Regions:
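N-terminal alpha-helical segment
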Residues: 33-34, 69-72, 98
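Flexible coil segments in periplasmic/lumen-exposed cytochrome c-class electron-transfer proteins
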Residues: 25-38, 56, 100-138
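Short cysteine clusters
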Residues: 59-62
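Residue-level signal for mature regions of secreted extracellular proteins and peptides
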Residues: 15, 52-55
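Generic anion/oxyanion-binding catalytic loop in active/binding sites
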Residues: 11, 40, 78, 102-105
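N-terminal export/targeting leaders of redox proteins
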Residues: 1-45, 134-138
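Gly/Gly-Pro-rich "capping" loops immediately C-terminal to redox-active cysteine motifs
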Residues: 41-52, 64-94
Length: 138
């Protein structure tokens, strides 16, 4: 048996597995324990207000001040984001996804990250109201 050929086949197989893992959606990398984390600041008005300021300082550059997304960055008001477990969003803030332009915010203290999540979750799928120009009937 040709051990070099067998070794080469194993390397190719390993490379394929690693590539498939790297290309998997980020949510597949979240462990059950991480996913089960619950935001200690959920639905707290003070935390949501603090999260809004933090969002403006750290997130609005890419996701837009209205969180509807900009420059090919995703909206955070979508049903997918709003249905995501708090722990999944926390994982993303902690780890980021540089392949898609999302930096890690692990340098921010945990309470700060949870406040940002409380704010994002408070947005729901609602979009800011658009003014109807004068003279236009609805």
């Amino acid at each position: 048996m040709n051990w070099r050929r067998l070794g080469g086949a194993w390397l190719v197989a390993l490379a394929m597995i690693l590539c498939a893992w790297a290309e998997a959606p980020w949510v597949n990398h979240v462990t059950d324990a991480e996913r089960a984390q619950i935001n200690p600041y959920a639905h707290q008005a003070e935390a949501i207000a603090a999260g809004a300021k933090l969002f403006a300082d750290h997130c609005a550059k890419c996701h837009g001040s209205d969180a509807l997304g900009r420059r090919k960055r995703p909206s955070l008001r979508t049903a997918e984001v709003q249905r995501a477990a708090d722990g999944e969003i926390f994982w993303m803030l902690k780890n980021g996804d540089l392949r898609h332009g999302m930096p890690s915010w692990s340098a921010l203290p945990e309470p700060t990250r949870w406040q940002i999540i409380a704010y994002v979750k408070s947005l729901g799928e609602s979009a800011p109201a658009k003014a109807i120009p004068v003279g236009i009937k609805k």
